[in-house]
């Protein structure tokens, strides 16, 4: 059997990592400023994380949700306290797409409605409901297509108000920052108006913080810069250092009942041990503060750079839109400077490094950028 060929891969195979450094099987060293799509939030091989996961594996790796698992309760308590959502409840699953699926389902159960409002440029996942609210027809099969989803432009309050005025929508779903679209940030004012419109029309507000959450922007959730709270918040990527996990933070106004949601693997012992360790490192090492400081430094160094059309981002969720003549810069950073970055289209380089990226690594990137873009 061969692999089903759906991934465009670099011909590089990392075999070990420490902090923000990776080594391939030839021993070549790389600076990792992408973290496997914002997953590696505390760096590769953090000692506290390794100890927690290996220790749990020796004890018990998995049992289903047919029994009590105190690690789930510990994770919920820590996540609630650190995120500022301590009065909410946590449903654990296995990925960001699954978290969004369950959030959409909860919103529909809660409101008795079926329609969902989403935004141009949105990416919420590749499974049934999640891909239906993703603004990319090329990955939406006929099976996933539905008349129940409407897309409107980001930051267009009037368009949202027109759609919600009829009281037909179960939910509005929005990313804290649009990642795949190229680091597009909804304005604080727009998020505040969105919250107000949802309240007025009885519509659930879902904040997809799968990529933009877990401290990446310098706040635990990106939407907290706007001073709002969502009814449902979805999380996944930065939660557990690469061990599959996802979650939905659920408002107290939503009623739980046995069988309403469910999962076999969600909230298993290994995933919870990993997620608890990640939160302990984030809190213990003040990684929210570090992410905010380092993000400001990147902006000071690169905003206005001759190669840049626009610098976008908050904290360590950064989009560098280059001018047309620098379209191949990401590949040059990888092959000439051995620096992993992400992309959104041909001209946006995405930086999603570990939240504990050292200043030395940040300077290494800026020096490499300047060297490759100098006249």
Model-derived features with residue positions:
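Conserved N-terminal phosphate-binding loop of PLP-dependent enzymes in the Aspartate aminotransferase
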Residues: 1-375
């Amino acid at each position: 059997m061969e692999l089903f060929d759906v991934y465009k891969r670099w011909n590089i195979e990392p075999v070990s990592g420490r902090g923000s450094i990776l080594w391939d099987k030839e021993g070549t060293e790389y600076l990792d400023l992408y973290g496997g799509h914002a997953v590696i939030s505390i760096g590769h091989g953090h000692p506290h994380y390794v100890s927690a996961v290996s220790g749990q594996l020796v004890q018990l790796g998995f049992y289903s949700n047919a029994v009590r698992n105190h690690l789930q309760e510990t994770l919920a308590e820590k996540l609630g306290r650190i995120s500022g959502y301590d009065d909410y409840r946590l449903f654990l699953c296995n990925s960001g797409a699954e978290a969004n699926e369950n959030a959409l389902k909860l919103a529909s159960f809660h409101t008795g409605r079926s329609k969902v409002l989403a935004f141009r440029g949105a990416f919420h996942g590749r499974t049934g409901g999640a891909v239906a609210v993703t603004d990319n027809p090329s990955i939406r099969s006929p099976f996933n297509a539905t008349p129940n989803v409407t897309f409107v432009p980001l930051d267009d309050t009037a368009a949202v108000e027109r759609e919600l005025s009829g009281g037909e929508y179960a939910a509005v779903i929005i990313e804290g920052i649009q990642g795949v679209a190229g680091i597009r940030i909804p304005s604080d004012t727009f998020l505040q108006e969105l919250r107000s419109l949802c309240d007025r029309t009885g519509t659930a507000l879902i904040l997809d913080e799968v990529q933009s959450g877990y401290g990446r922007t310098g706040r635990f959730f990106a939407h907290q810069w706007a001073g709002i709270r969502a009814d449902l918040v979805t999380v996944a990527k930065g939660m557990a250092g690469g061990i599959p996990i996802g979650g939905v933070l659920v408002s107290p106004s939503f009623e739980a009942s046995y069988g309403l949601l469910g999962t076999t693997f969600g909230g298993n012992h290994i995933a919870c041990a990993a997620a608890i360790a990640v939160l302990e490192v984030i809190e213990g090492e003040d990684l929210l503060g570090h992410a905010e400081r380092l993000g400001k430094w990147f902006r000071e160094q690169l905003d206005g750079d001759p190669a840049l059309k626009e610098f976008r981002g908050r904290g360590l969720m950064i989009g560098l839109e280059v001018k047309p003549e620098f379209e191949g810069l990401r590949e040059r950073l990888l092959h000439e400077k051995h620096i992993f970055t992400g992309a959104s289209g041909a001209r946006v380089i995405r930086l999603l490094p570990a939240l504990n990226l050292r200043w030395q690594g940040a300077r290494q990137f800026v020096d490499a950028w300047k060297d490759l873009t100098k006249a």
